[in-house]
């Protein structure tokens, strides 16, 4: 697009450069309407180019009435390209000189700066001129990760929804996986979202690595060393047993070549095994032990595994624990939308999962996202969005689940090499691991009222931008100061307002809209039933008819019998 700029001399707010220090210029400005203020953009005439800078300080000129002095940080320039068309580019090839003229940028200049390339997407409007769309470069934003920071109740969730909808619109080859910590984004993307709830999630226990599985077994508490050693020894054997049993059915002569104890599987190999096989191995070991204390370790471990298997809250892990089946490819395709079928984004709802396993589940999906990118050589670009990021990658190394932090840090540091990009969302950036957030080169800073959060934000930006951060405590609803690789200049913007149907659930709640009358007893009973159901107790209200106790699922006995059956089959094949 060709832009013809009006001469600076005819522009309002004409000023003159009277001091220069590096890329900073001091400009004498007349008292004009509208007056220049902090955050405004100025254009400086510099030969065939116009230097573009942002006002970071304004004060009265002492000896000259009706004039003010502005300090401007120069950040880019508008220059003609080979075809004579004006283009904006970041950085400068020349510096301002004493006597150069300056003026407030026109709407035409602002549009030129923010028009971007073919992959640019509109996410809102500029605070300085609401007629000018605020556009971001999706390629630059995704390639070097991004973060959205803001206190609760400032429109952060709707801002995230606007950004992700822009990704879906303008980058159809990018799949999006979002961790939804409060189950509020299900309706933000319409029919394009694949919503995975705790009831529909399928994440078999054998896809967990050892650290993740142990964290589930012990509910986030410290593990017992003796029991961990038992798992370390027998999980690889159980994997070998599953493979051997599979070969018995598919290749009778191949089965005798597989020794389950020498199958080559490691503790972390993501291959199926049956929980009853693992239990049978532990039970067999317990039967050979004479030391009561050692036997108790086996007994307690078996009890833990049986409790998990029979707990309906863990059905997403153990529903088919004794059925088998290698479903890893199908699960990866479903979670990461490898075959989108019109739904390129997965919204994984975490509220409703057992609180003690949420960290492990997040760790699993983050690790799987990176590993799939690694082994697929980045053929399927994936944006991994982590809400409540300070919970899963805390700055305090003694808090949280260490492997989850490492999984997110691995994506932050190396993910872009394999087409895995990171988007972080947090209301407490000061509690987020500084190494993780330092890898995010595009930041959207919404209102932050906590001084520690503001201090961290100031430390994360250059001195030129630091003055703009002073706006952060007073930003309005849906407003943000955005800066970094995804934007041409540090920008104060207002995110696009979503329709009522697309708003995150947290932003549709209004106290005045809620019923204030007495609660109906039937409604309260329904709430209690849902409450108990989420804890695995089922419906137990007084109106429910008594039900016979369910028959306990066969566990150790069947597993031991299966082990003996498998050995007999292998020996029989060997003799024949």
Which residues make up each language-model segment?
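Basic- and hydrophobic-enriched, low-structure N-terminal and domain-boundary segments
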Residues: 1-149, 377-380, 395
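Glycine-rich phosphate-binding loop of nucleotide-binding enzymes
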Residues: 120-203, 482, 512-516, 524-525
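Conserved P-loop NTPase motor module
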Residues: 273, 477-576
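Hydrophobic residues in beta-strands of the RecA-like P-loop NTPase core, especially within AAA+ ATPase
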Residues: 179, 386, 425-426
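P-loop NTPase motor domains
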Residues: 183-187, 193, 205-208, 212-410
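Conserved ATP-driven motor cores of ASCE-family P-loop NTPases powering translocation/secretion/packaging/pilus
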Residues: 219, 409-414, 418-494
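Conserved beta-strand position immediately N-terminal to the Walker
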Residues: 146, 348, 423
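Conserved AAA+ ATPase small/helical "lid" subdomain
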Residues: 229-250, 470-501
């Amino acid at each position: 697009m060709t832009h013809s700029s009006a001469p600076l001399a005819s522009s309002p707010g004409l000023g003159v450069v009277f001091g220069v220090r590096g890329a900073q210029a001091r400009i004498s400005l007349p008292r004009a309407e509208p007056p220049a203020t902090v955050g405004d953009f100025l254009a400086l005439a510099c030969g065939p180019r116009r230097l573009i800078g942002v006002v970071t300080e304004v004060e009265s000129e002492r000896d000259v009435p009706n004039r003010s002095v502005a300090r401007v940080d120069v950040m880019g320039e508008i220059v003609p390209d080979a075809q004579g068309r004006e283009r904006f580019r970041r950085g400068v090839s020349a510096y301002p000189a004493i006597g150069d003229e300056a003026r407030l940028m026109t709407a035409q200049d602002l549009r030129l700066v923010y028009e971007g390339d073919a992959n640019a997407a509109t996410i809102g409007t500029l605070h300085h001129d609401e007629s000018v769309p605020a556009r971001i470069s999706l390629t630059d934003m995704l390639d070097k990760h991004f973060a959205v920071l803001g206190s609760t109740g400032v429109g952060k969730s709707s801002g995230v929804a606007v950004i992700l909808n822009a990704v879906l619109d303008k980058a159809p080859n990018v799949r999006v996986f979002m961790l939804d910590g409060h189950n509020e984004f299900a309706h933000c993307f319409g029919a394009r979202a694949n919503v995975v709830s705790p009831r529909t999630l399928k994440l078999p226990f054998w896809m967990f690595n050892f650290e993740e599985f142990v964290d589930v077994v012990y509910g986030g508490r410290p593990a017992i060393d003796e029991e961990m050693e038992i798992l370390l020894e027998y999980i690889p054997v159980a994997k070998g047993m599953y493979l051997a049993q599979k070969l018995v059915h598919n290749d009778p002569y191949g089965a005798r070549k597989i020794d389950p104890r020498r199958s080559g599987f490691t503790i972390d190999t993501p291959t199926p095994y049956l929980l009853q096989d693992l239990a049978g191995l532990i039970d067999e070991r317990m039967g050979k032990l004479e030391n009561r204390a050692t036997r108790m370790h086996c007994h307690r471990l078996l009890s833990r595994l049986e409790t998990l298997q029979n707990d309906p809250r863990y059905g997403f892990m153990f529903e088919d624990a004794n059925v088998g089946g290698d479903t890893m490819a199908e699960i990866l395709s479903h979670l990461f939308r490898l075959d989108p079928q019109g739904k390129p984004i997965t919204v994984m709802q975490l509220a409703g999962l057992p609180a003690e396993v949420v960290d492990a589940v997040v760790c699993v999906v983050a690790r799987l996202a990176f590993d799939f990118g690694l082994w697929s050589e980045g053929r399927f670009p994936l944006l991994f969005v982590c809400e409540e990021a300070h919970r899963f990658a805390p700055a305090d190394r003694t808090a949280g689940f260490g492997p989850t932090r490492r999984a997110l840090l691995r994506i932050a540091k190396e993910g872009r090499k394999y087409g895995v990009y990171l988007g972080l969302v947090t209301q407490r950036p000061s509690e987020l691991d500084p190494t993780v957030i330092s890898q995010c080169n595009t930041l959207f800073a919404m209102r932050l009222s906590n001084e520690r959060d503001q201090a961290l934000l100031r430390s994360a930006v250059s001195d030129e931008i630091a003055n703009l951060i002073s706006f952060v405590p007073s930003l309005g609803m849906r407003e943000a100061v955005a800066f970094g690789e995804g934007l041409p200049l540090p920008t104060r913007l207002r995110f696009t307002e979503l329709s009522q149907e697309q708003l995150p659930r947290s932003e549709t709640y209004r106290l005045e809209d809620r019923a204030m009358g007495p609660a109906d007893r039937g409604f309260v009973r329904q709430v209690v039933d849902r409450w108990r159901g989420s804890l695995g107790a089922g419906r137990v209200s007084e109106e429910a008819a008594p039900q016979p106790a369910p028959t306990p699922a066969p566990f150790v006995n069947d597993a031991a019998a299966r082990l003996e059956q498998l050995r007999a089959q292998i020996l029989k094949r060997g003799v024949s």
